[in-house]
Swiss-Prot record:
Location of the protein in the cell: Secreted
Ribosomal protein listed as a keyword: no
GO molecular function terms noted in the UniProt entry: neurohypophyseal hormone activity
Family statement drawn from the similarity comment of this UniProt entry: Belongs to the vasopressin/oxytocin family.
Name of the featured protein: Glumitocin
Alphabetically ordered keywords of this record: Amidation, Disulfide bond, Hormone, Secreted
Length: 9
């Protein structure tokens, strides 16, 4: 995931 695109961590 990325800096502001990580819903699960």
């Amino acid at each position: 995931c990325y800096i502001s695109n990580c819903p699960q961590g």
